[in-house]
């Protein structure tokens, strides 16, 4: 299971990851001051980060062929976890109308975060094993739809539209990167969009909040819209405006004090803007962009060595994190309605933080295998 490559992790990439992690750790602590017992959330986030770093370090030791060998079972195992959330309490747990959590003794676990990695690992394996079949008009179409919809249906039943969109888009972009024909890709994408559209329509007919959130968000100008669905967005923009260039100082923001809902999770970018200003926001954007550009370069390097599985995994990880980061920023800037998209490496949250760090550990391992001696590379995928 464990195998040395003779290489150390890329120091520039590792430094960028740790820098953003520490910055997010400080800001997450500051953002939680207004609503909670700050020390409790500070300790919890510290534990999540330590667990995530320990698991990421473990992933540095595990060769990619281990994931390829067990990708199918990991995917099935995660699907089982997605079904467990529907069990009555104390196992399953519903929060704000969404059934997404499993209760363990000391913490809540969100299987949808695990599915983001499981889908990438399994889709990469599928694209390598079924390289010829996946490009056939009907056979490839049916197989890819089964894989994506098996997770998507469960996520929609959990009322987790955000995870459904991120996971489905990541899988579609991986298919595109693997050379799947645009006609097939269009059919798969169209089917998924239709399914989400029907789900939103049914949700609207049944009085659900998702359809209302979409329609009310864009029905009129944001600042004259008195709907409660845009209140969070308004408060986020007010916070960013208060920060100006250099911010009001760490811990000195006022939006987190009862005005801005979820300041430590989904809307933490607004707190970054208020307390550290445009300078802090640009630091986050440029640092994360550097990490992602390095990641895509790592995926390209693996592909040059004909290690398609490693390349697809690296590409999938970077696609997922880039999508989630971009959507969170757009949400905080009032471009799209608020939704449950944590900011990678920064937002408070156990499941999200741990699995993002695991994914980055796998990405660093891909790079280490690319740079190792040629004699060892024959064992890598």
List each model region and its residues.
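Short, small-residue-rich loop/turn micro-motifs
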Residues: 32, 240, 244, 333
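Flexible extramembrane loops and terminal tails that flank transmembrane helices
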Residues: 1-13
């Amino acid at each position: 299971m464990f195998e040395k490559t003779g290489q150390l992790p890329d120091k520039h990439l590792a430094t960028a990851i740790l820098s953003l992690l520490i910055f997010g750790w400080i800001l997450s602590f500051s953002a939680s001051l207004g609503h909670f017992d700050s020390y409790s959330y500070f300790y919890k986030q510290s534990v999540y980060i330590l667990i995530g770093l320990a698991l990421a370090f473990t992933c540095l030791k595990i060769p990619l062929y281990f994931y390829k060998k067990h990708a199918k079972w990991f995917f099935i195992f995660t699907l089982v976890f997605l079904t467990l959330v529907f069990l009555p309490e104390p196992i399953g747990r519903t929060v704000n109308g969404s059934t997404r959590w499993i209760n363990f003794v000391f913490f809540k676990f969100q299987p949808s975060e695990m599915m983001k990695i499981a889908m990438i690992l399994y889709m990469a394996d599928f694209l390598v094993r079924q390289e010829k079949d996946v490009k056939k008009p009907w056979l490839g179409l049916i197989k890819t739809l089964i894989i994506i919809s098996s997770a998507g249906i469960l996520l929609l039943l959990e009322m987790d539209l955000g995870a459904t969109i991120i996971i489905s888009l990541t899988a579609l972009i991986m298919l595109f990167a693997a050379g799947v024909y645009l006609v097939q890709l269009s059919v798969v994408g169209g089917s998924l969009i239709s399914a989400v559209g029907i789900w939103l329509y049914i949700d609207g007919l049944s009085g659900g909040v998702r359809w209302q959130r979409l329609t009310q968000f864009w029905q009129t100008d944001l600042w004259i819209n008195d709907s409660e669905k845009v209140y969070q967005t308004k408060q986020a923009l007010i916070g960013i405006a208060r920060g100006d260039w250099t911010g009001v100082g760490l811990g000195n923001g006022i939006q987190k004090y009862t005005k801005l809902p979820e300041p430590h999770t989904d809307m933490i970018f607004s707190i970054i803007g208020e307390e550290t200003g445009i300078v802090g926001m640009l630091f986050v954007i440029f640092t994360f962009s550097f990490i992602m550009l390095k990641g895509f370069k790592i995926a390209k390097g693996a592909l040059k060595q004909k290690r398609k599985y490693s390349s697809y995994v690296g590409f999938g990880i970077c696609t997922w994190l880039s999508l989630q980061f971009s959507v969170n920023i757009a949400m905080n800037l009032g471009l799209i309605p608020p939704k449950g998209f944590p900011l990678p490496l920064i937002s408070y949250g156990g499941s999200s933080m741990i699995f993002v760090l695991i994914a980055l550990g796998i990405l660093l391992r891909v790079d280490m295998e690319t740079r190792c001696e040629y004699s060892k590379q024959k064992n890598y995928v």
